[in-house]
Amino acid sequence: MAAPIAIPYQSFYSAAKAAINSLTLALRNEVRPFGIQVCAVQPGDIRTGFTAARKKSHAGSDIYKSLDHAVAVMERDEQNGMAPEAVAKIILKAANAKKCRALYTVGAQYKLFTLINKLLPATTVNWLVGRIYR
């Protein structure tokens, strides 16, 4: 979900995900005349070994307090994320669709986040996200 909603302390990751969505939308138009479909899947947090493999290395000073909290929120979300099999089902469905959607958001909570992101002003969404990760 880092593409539509930029996550604090993951600025490069969020930017890369947003770029993938832009690439998907542009490429989709470019290859449409050839009967080729392109889509991107936005799965949100998935339970994998990613959290356990995360390396943390910084001094324990107050300057890192908000970073520590943000990482704790990310780790909790990752550990409680959806099973990889659930995401695989959506990817398989998209791959087998006669006409796929441009963007697939996986999971009810992430669909809700995407809707909120579309309905509220960007400043409000950014403020809310900042409150979650602060």
What spans do the regions from the language model cover?
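Active-site segment of SDR-like NAD(P)-dependent oxidoreductases
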Residues: M1-I5, D45
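Active-site-adjacent segment of SDR/Rossmann-fold oxidoreductases
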Residues: I5, A26-Q37
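Active-site loop immediately N-terminal to the catalytic Tyr-X3-Lys motif
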Residues: I5-S11
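Conserved cofactor-binding/catalytic machinery of classical short-chain dehydrogenase/reductase
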Residues: S11, A19-S22
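Active-site helix of classical SDR
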Residues: A16
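C-terminal beta-strand-loop-alpha-helix "lid" module of Rossmann-like NAD(P)-dependent dehydrogenases
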Residues: R32-E78
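C-terminal tail/cap regions
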Residues: H58-R134
